Amino acid sequence: MQNKIDYKNIKKIGLVTRPNVSLDKEILKLQSILSIYKVELVLFKESSEILDLPKYGLDDLFKISDFVISLGGDGTLISLCRKACEYDKAVLGIHAGHLGFLTDFKVDEAENFFQAFFQGEFRIEKPYLLSVFLEDKQGKILEKLAFNDVVISKNNQASMAHIEVFRKEKKFNEYFGDGLIVATPAGSTAYNLSANGPIVYTLAQAFILTPVCSHSLTQRPIVLPKGFEIEIMAKDCILCIDGQENYKMNDFKSIKVGLSDKNVALIHPKNRDYFQILKEKLHWGN
């Protein structure tokens, strides 16, 4: 994953918007700002039906863009980050709607950001993703990435999920309850937090196992290091990646999860303060 951006030679910036929402006004404002720096704004083909701007499929958009803007909420950014890993491209999150943990500023603040950006005043953070290996009953392995989390939960018919977790074929825990969250540090402030999991610093090389509504009083979240791969077995459960992709666990012979070697470059304002964000979002202190 790229460690720096050649901000002096940016030619094209891609843009992907929150789905099913018209953001034409915001797109035109970004185009106007970028034109000052002689940068072309190109769109994902589903981002606008009206605007007369170059439009591309997602793969082509990543290929031709120096980096890509996510205009929406955290969900838009999360799905884009998984794609960005395939093309070694950075992502900038601008929020449109509810404020999240991952997007940094609104379109109204974009002029100030890009003025600083094109002077080299920005920072890049590279959080790690989870690798998920799904092996079907014919032995074919499908690898997926998760930016926030992988959630194993009971289906509608099951009264309780029974989830077994192994490392190197040795069982080290089993969970009875509503489910299990496997979260990245970046995802530790999402579903993991609402299930009383710990907040882990975004750039830590670790991941978290957090039980959901455990039927045991002694089950607690655990933080595991990079290089610690787990195998998860559960019948009649659903595996969900980032709240966006669902798989029936009965369809697979083996499911393994661990912190990936892949990370994604996120562009932030230079003055971004992770702990100040936590303080504001979680109402810490005064």
From Swiss-Prot:
It is found in: Cytoplasm. It comes from the Bacteria. InterPro entries: ATP-NAD_kinase_N, ATP-NAD_kinase_PpnK-typ_C, NAD/diacylglycerol_kinase_sf, NADK. Keywords: ATP-binding, Cytoplasm, Kinase, NAD, NADP, Nucleotide-binding, Transferase. Its EC number is 2.7.1.23. GO terms for cellular component: cytoplasm. It is an enzyme of class 2 (transferase). NAD(+) binds at D74, G75, N148, D149, D178, A186, T189, A190, Y191, N192, L193, S194, Q244. The active site is at D74 (proton acceptor). Its main location: cytoplasm. GO terms for molecular function: ATP binding; metal ion binding; NAD binding; NAD+ kinase activity. GO terms for biological process: NAD metabolic process; NADP biosynthetic process. Its cofactor is a divalent metal cation. SUPFAM superfamilies: NAD kinase/diacylglycerol kinase-like. The keyword DNA damage does not apply. Gene3D superfamilies: Probable inorganic polyphosphate/atp-NAD kinase, domain 1, Probable inorganic polyphosphate/atp-NAD kinase, domain 2. It catalyses: NAD(+) + ATP = ADP + NADP(+) + H(+). Involved in the regulation of the intracellular balance of NAD and NADP, and is a key enzyme in the biosynthesis of NADP. Catalyzes specifically the phosphorylation on 2'-hydroxyl of the adenosine moiety of NAD to yield NADP. Belongs to the NAD kinase family. PANTHER family: NAD KINASE (PTHR20275:SF0). This is NAD kinase. It comes from Campylobacter jejuni subsp. jejuni serotype O:6 (strain 81116 / NCTC 11828). The lineage of its organism: Bacteria, Pseudomonadati, Campylobacterota, Epsilonproteobacteria, Campylobacterales. The gene is nadK.
